[in-house]
Amino acid sequence: MNVSVVTERRTPAYSSLAAGELNGLVARALLTEARLTPKPGLVDIRNSGAHRDMDLAAFERSTTAIAPWMEKFFIMGNNTAALAAENVLVMLRPLGMACENDMLQATNGVNTHRRAIFAFGLLSAAIGRLLARGEPLEQNRICDQVARLSRNIVAHELSAKKAGKLTKSETHFQCYGLSGARGEAESGFRTVRTQALPVFNRVVQEHDDTHLALLQTLLHLMAWNDDTNLVSRGGLEGLYYVQQQAQKLLWQGGVLVEGGIEAMQSLDDELILRNLSPGGSADLLAVTWFLSHFPAGSLYPE
């Protein structure tokens, strides 16, 4: 089965962004990722991946519910720009919880976008801070602000010893050293900046095809991202299996060679059988698409 998806051409880089525009850009990022097909183990147009409790329609409803909240994250970041970044995270949390509640109402209690709310809430607040300070909207500046907002979040939330049963995130960190979405945010989306964006930009430049670029980028993320969603479903064995299979496809050329799309579909079928879904990599793919709409800027912003 060949699946053909038409994706929009990249828009010009943003030099400025109004709060209302941000809602639309985040919604497009989430929908672009959700509709990208084929995605091994993930919800897409072809199937629901390794998920029995959600489908593409649920992701679309969820996106409609959470996108309007990005403006609120933006405004909070804008209004608190004079404060030290590490003091703002506590103010963003109630917005995140309210946004998550709207998501759950839209999906009848299914968690479709919890990690995405965390990532895009921070990105939206970071953009608000930069604009309040009169600084340019550049990938590295935005990600630097996210890192500042998230400073010490891993130490505070994952490594501290607490009474009672550990959460999944605490277990992943304390047993395996995997910091998940929190670690990626605290690093300023290092995986996105150093691995995903370079691949995406190269494929777009060489092939003028956003669809192929996103699929190839997803393969790179699956190959190298320590996706805790895979650990939750299949332990370290599941994580390593997906990484090895993605690396194998990349060595063969990924989706850029004849038969590449069919190989992705075969991997999709295999991950469904194994109940493995690289949801963390899917979230980073949406972040990649989002950040690609801004110029890279200086590697070490002041």
Curated annotation (Swiss-Prot):
EC number(s) reported in the record: 2.4.2.52
Q: Which GO terms describe its molecular function?
A: ATP binding; triphosphoribosyl-dephospho-CoA synthase activity
Recorded protein name is: Probable 2-(5''-triphosphoribosyl)-3'-dephosphocoenzyme-A synthase 1
Q: Which processes are annotated in GO (biological process)?
A: prosthetic group biosynthetic process
Q: Which reaction does it catalyse?
A: 3'-dephospho-CoA + ATP = 2'-(5''-triphospho-alpha-D-ribosyl)-3'-dephospho-CoA + adenine
Query: Could you say which protein family the record assigns here?
Result: Belongs to the CitG/MdcB family.
Quote the InterPro entries the UniProt record gives: CitG, TriPribosyl-deP-CoA_syn_CitG
Keyword match Nucleotide-binding: yes
Q: Which NCBIfam families match?
A: citrate_citG
Q: Which UniProt keywords apply?
A: ATP-binding, Nucleotide-binding, Transferase
Q: Please give the positions of the paired cysteines in each disulfide bond.
A: none
Q: Which domain of life is it from?
A: Bacteria
Asked if the keyword Repeat belongs to this entry, the reply reads no
